[in-house]
Amino acid sequence: IMTVNQDTKKILLTTTPRDAYVPIADGGNNQNDKLTHAGIYGVDASIHTLENLYGIDLNYYARLNFTSFLKLIDLLGGVDVYNDQEFTAHTNGKHYPVGNIHLDSEMALGFVRERYSLTNGDGDRGRNQQKVITAIIQKMTSAEALKNYDAIIQGLQDSVQTNMPPETMVSLVNTQLASGGKYTVTN
């Protein structure tokens, strides 16, 4: 969950473990099950499950699959993150050293998917996902990326599912271009 305050330029990322047992909304009839199983009933069931869990309204969603994630990272020219534990990913066999690392799309996908090699498993995976999301936000809100907004949207339009109207996206881009400044991202 990403909570954005445009006035203060602060973003809060909230990660819920995929294996958390929660009442699954809609088709799940509020029976407790793993959060990841909410997706069986569709995007709305996932959204309603999280809304019920946290007592919030989620205005918009963006759904990316692996292909759209790879495209996004490629369109941004990769992302830079700090990796706090060395590991080799089971998914792609790539090695991730401790320290500041640049991730191309394949490396980024392995970084956000890995859990088995990490000390705290899914918890560490969630933190790695937040690191990559933070890096994406920093790149996407930069003047350079905003000026290339059309190319990024064109590159992703067939592979990202969202309920955010295009005019809202344009308004967000224009607001960021006019106000400038970086967002502070916390978890």
Region spans (language model):
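Non-catalytic, solvent-exposed segments at the cell envelope interface
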Residues: M2-N187
